[in-house]
């Protein structure tokens, strides 16, 4: 029997500022996988945002060149990291995405303010709104490049998974804020099957 080599994997935690990506990362990033994060770089090296972002980008590119596995967190509001994921897939990487969003950017604004009050990093309000709109508009491309993609609405106390792509098969789940038509618009996917993605019993 032929030995099939496992593809190298990238795990990406994506979504607008203040959606709650970091909480997902803490729980779901495998301990054996290197985690590349600009906020951590900024804190450790005491550099500014731009320098930290540039260092993180160089690290991701270096890992990609060496075909090494890694995990990273991104707002994904521009095509830069989307381009990296597309290149990675062409190189034979397996792409796993956890996308964390909210139903309204005002939630993100308040969460960032709460984070700052607790000593966390700030993001200007106008940037949160602008990035939210751009990030949401790119979701169909994120879904397309991912081998596995989970989308969670993290507006409430408990996150609610509204969508899952497993290879080429897609599933959705509904709640008050998310019905099928809205999930189709968000993801660009119309061929999907309803499934309990939240183990409600």
Regions inferred by a protein language model and the residue ranges of each:
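Phosphate-binding P-loop
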Residues: 1-7, 63-64
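The conserved Walker
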Residues: 16-17
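Conserved glycine(s) of the Walker
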Residues: 20
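Conserved substrate/cofactor phosphate-moiety recognition/catalytic segment
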Residues: 23-70
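Residue-level recognition of beta-strand->loop/alpha-helix junctions
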Residues: 37, 74, 99-101
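NTP-dependent small-molecule kinase module
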Residues: 143-201
């Amino acid at each position: 029997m032929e030995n099939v080599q496992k593809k190298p994997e990238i795990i990406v935690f994506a979504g607008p500022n203040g959606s709650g990506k970091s909480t997902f990362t803490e729980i779901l990033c495998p301990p054996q996988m290197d985690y590349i994060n600009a906020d951590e770089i900024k804190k450790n090296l005491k550099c500014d945002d731009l320098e930290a972002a540039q260092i993180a980008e160089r690290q991701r590119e270096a890992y990609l060149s060496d075909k090494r596995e890694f995990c990273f967190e991104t707002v994904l509001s521009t095509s830069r990291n989307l381009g990296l994921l597309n290149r990675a897939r062409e190189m034979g990487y397996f792409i796993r995405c956890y996308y964390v969003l909210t139903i309204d950017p005002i939630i993100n604004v308040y969460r960032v303010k709460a984070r700052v009050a607790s000593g966390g990093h700030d993001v200007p309000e106008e940037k949160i709104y602008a990035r939210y709109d751009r990030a949401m508009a790119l979701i169909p491309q994120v879904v397309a490049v991912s081998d596995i993609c989970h989308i969670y609405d993290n507006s409430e106390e408990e996150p609610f998974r509204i969508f899952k792509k497993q290879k080429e098969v897609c599933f959705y789940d509904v709640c008050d804020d998310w019905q099928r038509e809205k999930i189709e618009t968000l993801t660009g996917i119309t061929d999907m099957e309803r499934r309990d993605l939240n183990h409600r019993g």
